[in-house]
């Protein structure tokens, strides 16, 4: 369940980061602020069972890969070298997810 929170937080990061370029009204900025807040709340909640470094790395990686791919869909240029390094980043994200165990401890450090 906690990895689901990280995944949703990462997807929200893609949405708000991609929206920054197109925001041109107060309502747009309010929505972006809400998306930022919700994404970080979900990320922080995931820290209850997932090591902070792993959760944050996966969160940022999802945001990076997703935002980059969104840029490509919206017509931004890309190269074979960029795609290679994006694939390496994706492999690192998957590795962090696969080799990180969730903690059994409760919030506050009690076991």
Swiss-Prot record:
Pfam families: Multi_Drug_Res
GO cellular component, one term: plasma membrane
GO MF terms held by the record: transmembrane transporter activity
The UniProt record lists the keyword Cell membrane: yes
Membrane-crossing segments per the record: 3-23, 24-44, 54-74, 80-100
Transmembrane helix recorded as keyword: yes
UniProt keywords, alphabetically: Cell membrane, Membrane, Transmembrane, Transmembrane helix, Transport
Annotated GO biological process: transmembrane transport
Compartment(s) of residence: Cell membrane
Domain of life, per lineage: Bacteria
Membrane topology: Multi-pass membrane protein
Alphabetical list of PANTHER family matching this protein: GUANIDINIUM EXPORTER, SMR FAMILY PROTON-DEPENDENT DRUG EFFLUX TRANSPORTER SUGE
Family: Belongs to the drug/metabolite transporter (DMT) superfamily. Small multidrug resistance (SMR) (TC 2.A.7.1) family.
Record's protein name: Uncharacterized membrane protein YvdS
